[in-house]
């Protein structure tokens, strides 16, 4: 379950930012999950709760935003959105795609008191 290590890294970033800015408590966190990141929402929510224990983010509300991946098609030279690794180009139906974005988990925003 790699979701736990991803969430631990995200919480470290959140904790560092909160401490740097003298925040008393983190009340909300917005994560962006790419379509090709291979993480499951239930596992992320469970892991995030565990990773937040004993931090300024403990008990905060978690918001998750899913983003499609972007890829470059070598056959028609178009940037396209894809949702799966085995996707074909929607323009030319080629399968020679280079994934550029959408395979990560990012902390997009935090809400604080």
Curated annotation (Swiss-Prot):
Q: Provide the residue positions that the database annotates as binding Ni(2+).
A: 2-3
Give the Gene Ontology MF terms in alphabetical order.
nickel cation binding; zinc ion binding
Q: Which UniProt keywords apply?
A: Metal-binding, Nickel, Zinc
Q: Does the keyword NADP apply?
A: no
Question: Residues that bind Zn(2+), according to the entry?
Answer: 73, 76, 89, 92
Does the entry feature the keyword Zinc, yes or no? yes
InterPro entries, alphabetized: HybF, Hydgase_Ni_incorp_HypA/HybF_CS, HypA/HybF
Q: Which GO terms describe its biological process?
A: protein maturation; protein modification process
Q: Which family does it belong to?
A: Belongs to the HypA/HybF family. HybF subfamily.
Function, as annotated, reads: Involved in the maturation of [NiFe] hydrogenases. Required for nickel insertion into the metal center of the hydrogenase.
Specify the protein name: Hydrogenase maturation factor HybF
What gene name is given for the protein in this entry? hybF
């Amino acid at each position: 379950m790699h979701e736990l290590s991803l969430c631990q890294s995200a919480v470290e970033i959140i904790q560092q930012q909160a401490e740097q800015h003298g925040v008393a408590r983190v009340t909300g966190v917005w994560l962006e999950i790419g379509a090709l990141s291979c993480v499951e929402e239930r596992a992320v929510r469970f892991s995030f709760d565990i990773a937040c224990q004993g931090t300024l983010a403990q008990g905060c509300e978690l918001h998750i935003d899913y983003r499609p991946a972007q890829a470059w098609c070598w056959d028609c030279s178009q940037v396209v959105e894809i949702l799966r690794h085995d996707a074909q180009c929607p323009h030319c139906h080629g399968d020679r795609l280079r994934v550029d974005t959408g395979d990560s988990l990012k902390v997009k925003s935090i809400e604080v008191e």
